[in-house]
Amino acid sequence: KLSEENDEQEDIEKVTITSDWAMDNDEVQEEETTLLFEPNIVYTPQTLEELKKMFIDQFFHFQMKWVSSTLREKSYVDPKFMRDTLLRSMLQTLPDNYLIFYFPILRVKKAPIELDIIILTPTECLCITLLEQEDQAVFIANSERFWTKKVGKNEKKLLSPLIQLNRMEKIIEQIFAQNNIELPIRKVLLTRNGYIDYPGTMYGISFVDKRKFPEWMNYLKHSVSPMKHMQIRGAQAILNTVQTTSFHRDIW
Protein backbone atom coordinates (compact mmCIF):
# COMPACT_ATOMS: atom_id res chain seq x y z
CA LYS A 1 0.00 0.00 0.00
CA LEU A 2 2.88 2.37 0.79
CA SER A 3 4.32 1.68 -2.65
CA GLU A 4 1.00 2.55 -4.31
CA GLU A 5 0.85 5.85 -2.42
CA ASN A 6 4.39 6.71 -3.51
CA ASP A 7 3.53 5.92 -7.15
CA GLU A 8 0.46 8.11 -6.93
CA GLN A 9 2.52 10.97 -5.47
CA GLU A 10 5.06 10.63 -8.30
CA ASP A 11 2.28 10.74 -10.90
CA ILE A 12 0.94 13.95 -9.39
CA GLU A 13 4.37 15.57 -9.44
CA LYS A 14 4.85 14.64 -13.11
CA VAL A 15 1.82 16.62 -14.24
CA THR A 16 3.03 19.19 -16.74
CA ILE A 17 2.12 22.83 -16.32
CA THR A 18 0.34 24.48 -19.22
CA SER A 19 -0.64 28.12 -19.42
CA ASP A 20 -4.00 27.15 -20.90
CA TRP A 21 -5.11 24.93 -18.01
CA ALA A 22 -8.37 26.75 -17.47
CA MET A 23 -8.90 27.49 -21.17
CA ASP A 24 -9.51 23.81 -21.87
CA ASN A 25 -12.21 23.55 -19.23
CA ASP A 26 -15.26 25.11 -20.85
CA GLU A 27 -17.80 24.33 -18.17
CA VAL A 28 -18.33 25.48 -14.63
CA GLN A 29 -17.99 22.30 -12.61
CA GLU A 30 -20.45 21.48 -9.86
CA GLU A 31 -19.18 21.49 -6.30
CA GLU A 32 -20.73 20.85 -2.92
CA THR A 33 -20.97 24.61 -2.55
CA THR A 34 -20.19 27.39 -4.96
CA LEU A 35 -19.86 30.01 -2.23
CA LEU A 36 -16.57 28.79 -0.76
CA PHE A 37 -13.23 28.91 -2.56
CA GLU A 38 -10.85 26.07 -1.79
CA PRO A 39 -7.74 26.04 -4.03
CA ASN A 40 -6.63 22.60 -5.08
CA ILE A 41 -2.90 22.04 -5.54
CA VAL A 42 -2.83 19.18 -8.06
CA TYR A 43 0.87 19.41 -8.87
CA THR A 44 4.05 20.77 -7.32
CA PRO A 45 4.78 24.26 -8.68
CA GLN A 46 8.44 24.79 -9.50
CA THR A 47 8.37 28.56 -9.12
CA LEU A 48 6.35 31.20 -7.33
CA GLU A 49 4.97 32.39 -10.67
CA GLU A 50 3.65 28.90 -11.44
CA LEU A 51 1.94 28.82 -8.06
CA LYS A 52 0.36 32.22 -8.70
CA LYS A 53 -0.81 31.10 -12.15
CA MET A 54 -2.42 27.96 -10.75
CA PHE A 55 -4.17 29.98 -8.04
CA ILE A 56 -5.61 32.72 -10.29
CA ASP A 57 -6.80 30.19 -12.89
CA GLN A 58 -8.70 28.24 -10.24
CA PHE A 59 -9.97 31.47 -8.70
CA PHE A 60 -11.30 32.56 -12.11
CA HIS A 61 -13.49 29.46 -12.22
CA PHE A 62 -14.68 30.17 -8.69
CA GLN A 63 -15.55 33.74 -9.69
CA MET A 64 -17.69 32.42 -12.53
CA LYS A 65 -19.48 30.05 -10.14
CA TRP A 66 -19.97 32.77 -7.55
CA VAL A 67 -21.35 35.33 -9.99
CA SER A 68 -23.86 32.82 -11.38
CA SER A 69 -25.08 31.50 -8.02
CA THR A 70 -26.97 32.44 -4.92
CA LEU A 71 -27.88 30.35 -1.90
CA ARG A 72 -31.24 29.45 -3.45
CA GLU A 73 -30.70 29.79 -7.21
CA LYS A 74 -28.18 29.01 -9.93
CA SER A 75 -27.71 30.06 -13.55
CA TYR A 76 -26.06 28.15 -16.36
CA VAL A 77 -22.88 29.83 -17.60
CA ASP A 78 -22.34 29.89 -21.35
CA PRO A 79 -19.04 28.04 -21.99
CA LYS A 80 -17.90 30.88 -24.25
CA PHE A 81 -17.30 33.02 -21.16
CA MET A 82 -14.83 30.44 -19.82
CA ARG A 83 -12.83 30.85 -23.04
CA ASP A 84 -13.17 34.64 -23.20
CA THR A 85 -9.63 36.00 -22.90
CA LEU A 86 -10.73 39.60 -22.33
CA LEU A 87 -13.03 38.64 -19.46
CA ARG A 88 -10.29 36.49 -17.94
CA SER A 89 -7.78 39.32 -18.32
CA MET A 90 -10.08 41.84 -16.66
CA LEU A 91 -10.95 39.60 -13.72
CA GLN A 92 -7.34 38.55 -13.14
CA THR A 93 -5.72 41.95 -13.72
CA LEU A 94 -8.03 44.73 -12.60
CA PRO A 95 -8.24 45.68 -8.90
CA ASP A 96 -10.88 44.14 -6.65
CA ASN A 97 -12.46 47.56 -6.16
CA TYR A 98 -13.73 47.50 -9.77
CA LEU A 99 -17.24 46.17 -10.44
CA ILE A 100 -17.69 44.61 -13.88
CA PHE A 101 -20.86 43.97 -15.89
CA TYR A 102 -19.94 41.83 -18.90
CA PHE A 103 -22.53 42.02 -21.68
CA PRO A 104 -25.47 42.27 -19.26
CA ILE A 105 -29.07 42.10 -20.44
CA LEU A 106 -31.14 44.89 -18.92
CA ARG A 107 -34.90 45.27 -18.77
CA VAL A 108 -35.65 48.75 -20.13
CA LYS A 109 -39.35 49.60 -20.41
CA LYS A 110 -40.10 45.86 -20.13
CA ALA A 111 -37.89 45.09 -23.15
CA PRO A 112 -34.62 43.13 -22.86
CA ILE A 113 -31.61 45.07 -24.14
CA GLU A 114 -28.09 43.62 -24.25
CA LEU A 115 -25.33 46.08 -23.49
CA ASP A 116 -21.59 45.67 -23.85
CA ILE A 117 -19.09 46.04 -20.99
CA ILE A 118 -19.63 48.29 -17.99
CA ILE A 119 -16.92 48.85 -15.39
CA LEU A 120 -17.70 50.83 -12.26
CA THR A 121 -14.51 52.21 -10.75
CA PRO A 122 -14.52 54.18 -7.49
CA THR A 123 -14.54 57.45 -9.44
CA GLU A 124 -16.32 56.82 -12.76
CA CYS A 125 -18.38 54.49 -14.93
CA LEU A 126 -16.71 53.10 -18.05
CA CYS A 127 -18.97 52.10 -20.93
CA ILE A 128 -16.91 49.91 -23.26
CA THR A 129 -17.86 48.71 -26.74
CA LEU A 130 -15.67 45.90 -28.05
CA LEU A 131 -14.59 46.06 -31.69
CA GLU A 132 -12.65 42.89 -32.43
CA GLN A 133 -12.74 40.94 -35.66
CA GLU A 134 -9.80 39.89 -37.85
CA ASP A 135 -6.24 40.43 -36.60
CA GLN A 136 -4.64 43.62 -37.88
CA ALA A 137 -7.98 44.97 -39.10
CA VAL A 138 -8.15 48.75 -39.49
CA PHE A 139 -11.43 50.47 -38.64
CA ILE A 140 -11.84 53.82 -40.38
CA ALA A 141 -14.48 56.34 -39.34
CA ASN A 142 -16.08 57.65 -42.55
CA SER A 143 -19.24 59.22 -41.16
CA GLU A 144 -21.46 59.28 -38.11
CA ARG A 145 -23.37 56.22 -39.30
CA PHE A 146 -20.91 54.07 -41.24
CA TRP A 147 -17.29 52.98 -40.87
CA THR A 148 -14.99 51.00 -43.15
CA LYS A 149 -13.08 47.90 -42.09
CA LYS A 150 -9.87 47.18 -44.01
CA VAL A 151 -8.08 43.84 -43.83
CA GLY A 152 -5.19 43.80 -46.27
CA LYS A 153 -6.66 44.85 -49.62
CA ASN A 154 -10.23 43.96 -48.66
CA GLU A 155 -12.70 46.59 -47.50
CA LYS A 156 -16.13 46.24 -45.92
CA LYS A 157 -18.67 48.80 -44.78
CA LEU A 158 -20.06 48.38 -41.29
CA LEU A 159 -22.36 50.26 -38.94
CA SER A 160 -20.55 52.74 -36.73
CA PRO A 161 -19.74 51.13 -33.36
CA LEU A 162 -20.29 54.53 -31.77
CA ILE A 163 -24.04 54.07 -32.26
CA GLN A 164 -24.05 51.12 -29.85
CA LEU A 165 -21.65 52.91 -27.50
CA ASN A 166 -23.77 56.07 -27.33
CA ARG A 167 -26.91 53.98 -26.84
CA MET A 168 -25.34 52.23 -23.86
CA GLU A 169 -24.32 55.57 -22.37
CA LYS A 170 -27.88 56.92 -22.66
CA ILE A 171 -29.32 53.84 -20.91
CA ILE A 172 -26.84 54.07 -18.02
CA GLU A 173 -27.42 57.83 -17.76
CA GLN A 174 -31.16 57.19 -17.45
CA ILE A 175 -30.67 54.56 -14.74
CA PHE A 176 -28.34 56.83 -12.79
CA ALA A 177 -30.70 59.81 -13.08
CA GLN A 178 -33.67 57.77 -11.84
CA ASN A 179 -31.68 56.69 -8.78
CA ASN A 180 -29.88 59.98 -8.05
CA ILE A 181 -26.49 58.47 -8.87
CA GLU A 182 -23.78 61.04 -9.45
CA LEU A 183 -21.01 59.19 -11.24
CA PRO A 184 -19.22 60.45 -14.37
CA ILE A 185 -19.62 58.25 -17.47
CA ARG A 186 -16.70 57.79 -19.85
CA LYS A 187 -16.99 55.91 -23.14
CA VAL A 188 -14.32 53.60 -24.53
CA LEU A 189 -14.11 51.98 -27.97
CA LEU A 190 -11.79 49.00 -27.58
CA THR A 191 -9.98 46.64 -29.96
CA ARG A 192 -7.04 44.55 -28.78
CA ASN A 193 -6.11 43.08 -32.16
CA GLY A 194 -6.83 45.93 -34.59
CA TYR A 195 -6.41 49.62 -35.19
CA ILE A 196 -8.81 52.56 -35.07
CA ASP A 197 -8.39 55.41 -37.54
CA TYR A 198 -10.52 58.27 -36.28
CA PRO A 199 -9.77 61.78 -37.58
CA GLY A 200 -9.28 64.22 -34.74
CA THR A 201 -10.67 63.60 -31.27
CA MET A 202 -14.14 63.20 -29.81
CA TYR A 203 -15.15 64.58 -26.42
CA GLY A 204 -15.90 61.91 -23.82
CA ILE A 205 -14.68 58.95 -25.91
CA SER A 206 -11.36 57.13 -25.64
CA PHE A 207 -10.18 55.07 -28.61
CA VAL A 208 -8.10 52.15 -27.34
CA ASP A 209 -6.60 49.93 -30.03
CA LYS A 210 -3.75 47.44 -30.26
CA ARG A 211 -1.17 50.20 -29.81
CA LYS A 212 -2.74 51.64 -26.66
CA PHE A 213 -4.28 48.59 -24.97
CA PRO A 214 -1.29 47.59 -22.75
CA GLU A 215 -0.89 51.16 -21.49
CA TRP A 216 -4.65 51.47 -20.88
CA MET A 217 -4.82 48.24 -18.87
CA ASN A 218 -1.75 49.25 -16.90
CA TYR A 219 -3.43 52.55 -16.03
CA LEU A 220 -6.60 50.81 -14.84
CA LYS A 221 -4.89 48.20 -12.69
CA HIS A 222 -2.97 50.78 -10.67
CA SER A 223 -6.03 52.34 -9.09
CA VAL A 224 -5.42 53.03 -5.40
CA SER A 225 -8.78 54.55 -4.53
CA PRO A 226 -11.00 52.52 -2.16
CA MET A 227 -14.56 51.59 -3.11
CA LYS A 228 -16.99 54.49 -2.84
CA HIS A 229 -20.59 54.61 -1.68
CA MET A 230 -21.75 56.14 -4.98
CA GLN A 231 -19.99 53.37 -6.89
CA ILE A 232 -21.85 50.69 -4.93
CA ARG A 233 -25.16 52.52 -5.36
CA GLY A 234 -24.55 52.72 -9.09
CA ALA A 235 -23.88 48.99 -9.28
CA GLN A 236 -27.04 48.24 -7.30
CA ALA A 237 -29.11 50.46 -9.60
CA ILE A 238 -27.86 48.54 -12.64
CA LEU A 239 -28.39 45.18 -10.91
CA ASN A 240 -31.99 46.13 -10.21
CA THR A 241 -32.64 46.30 -13.96
CA VAL A 242 -30.64 43.23 -14.99
CA GLN A 243 -32.57 40.29 -16.43
CA THR A 244 -31.76 37.01 -14.68
CA THR A 245 -32.34 33.50 -16.00
CA SER A 246 -31.97 30.95 -13.22
CA PHE A 247 -33.41 27.85 -11.59
CA HIS A 248 -33.96 26.88 -7.96
CA ARG A 249 -31.50 24.52 -6.36
CA ASP A 250 -32.82 21.04 -5.54
CA ILE A 251 -32.44 21.62 -1.80
CA TRP A 252 -35.12 24.31 -2.01
Model feature map: region roles:
Residues 119-145:
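Active-site beta-strand-loop-beta-strand hairpin of nuclease catalytic cores
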Residues 138-162:
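Long, charge-dense
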Residues 1-112, 156-159, 163-252:
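Surface-exposed interaction regions that form or flank ligand-binding interfaces
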Residues 116:
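Phosphate-centric recognition/catalysis
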